[in-house]
Amino acid sequence: KGALTVTFTAPTERGTDRLILRLWPNGGPYASAGAHLFVSRVREGNRPLPVSYPDPTTLVIARPVAAGEQVVVSMNWRLLLPRETGLRMKGGGRSVRLGSFFPLLAWDGNDWALDPSTKFPSAEAWTTPIADFDVRVTQPAHLRVLASGQQIAPGKWRAQAVRDFTLALGRFEIVKGTAHVPASVRVTVGLEAFPGAEPVRLFLRRAILSLERYSALYGPYPWHTYTVVTMADLIGLTGGLEYPTLVYQPATSENVPHETAHQWFYSLVGNDQARDPWLDEGLATWAEAAVNGAPPFPDATIPPEVTNRIGEPMSFWDQFDTRRYFLGAYLQSSRALLSLGPRSQVDCAIRLYVIDNAYRIARPHDLLDALQTFFPDAEQKLEAYGAHF
């Protein structure tokens, strides 16, 4: 359980008639596994605010905010963790994982994001703005917390200019290193012990290599810390989970380059992950080759039912299994980018996309604008793969 205070400033050009926060533990596979996020005592100062719940994942606060006005709203929350493992939230056993676990402001820079949740346990359908987080955590003394941002004092964490906050609680083997991007970034890996777990220093080496390579290609990693937490209940390719400055990996396998690429594509440059999942997943899959030396799964065949559908929303992908979602949205989007021309030029265009859209919620036309600087026929080629602009 906890308490949350949110500060929101409406755009100077227009206001809003409400505030909306999303309660993601109440939807999709989380609710099915027994999770629930309760909210109480929503207030401004000492004044209670009226609220409504159009659906279990949506909290509407009836507080109009004029153009340029700043409002500070507080609330209490209580979370029941899911009974199942392998999700973005985990309780029980020897560890706890909390991802997108508290009421999240759903502002996309222009309006409120009201997309439904997805059925996939490791996928996400949320859109969140850049924010500064100051977090106080109380935990048993024998357990360690690893969290987004920096620990600034015992039990106090600060994460600046990020879209979300996550933490893991448990017993971890810790190793640390430094990436040069070129500024120094403190890299921490926490490994939850598990039979067959990969060596903890493998994760550290791959994290440092990925940060340095992507910083050279797409612009410097802008935060001071980066953390990789490997956990025993996460499995296979779908076990990687990305959050700003912290990612999760299965203890028995490693795909650090993909999750690290999300620090540029989702974290630094945001997107509506329900409407345009190819923007972050396709670009992260594309970027992997810069670290791994070759594109992933070069011999894989795209199933006909998802061929040339890269631009579809999560509501489309929800009808398929995880394998077809990966092949159709992740891998096929990467191949669509490769169809444009030389990889080095595509990387230059993506760097421009990052520069122009850092700390914003990007849309497909923002990526197209950057690509057309180098490839005038980019729209035609990407539309052939099913992109929508």
Predicted segments with their positions:
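Solvent-exposed beta-hairpin/edge-strand motifs
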Residues: T16-P48, L98-G99, T138-R144
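Extended, low-hydrophobicity, Ser/Thr/Pro/Gly-biased non-transmembrane segments
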Residues: W24, N76-A168
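A surface-exposed beta-strand-loop module
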Residues: Y30-R94
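Juxtacatalytic substrate-recognition/specificity segment
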Residues: V135, E173-D276
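Acidic/His/Gly-enriched intrinsically disordered linker/tail segments
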Residues: R275-S339, N357-R360, A378-F389
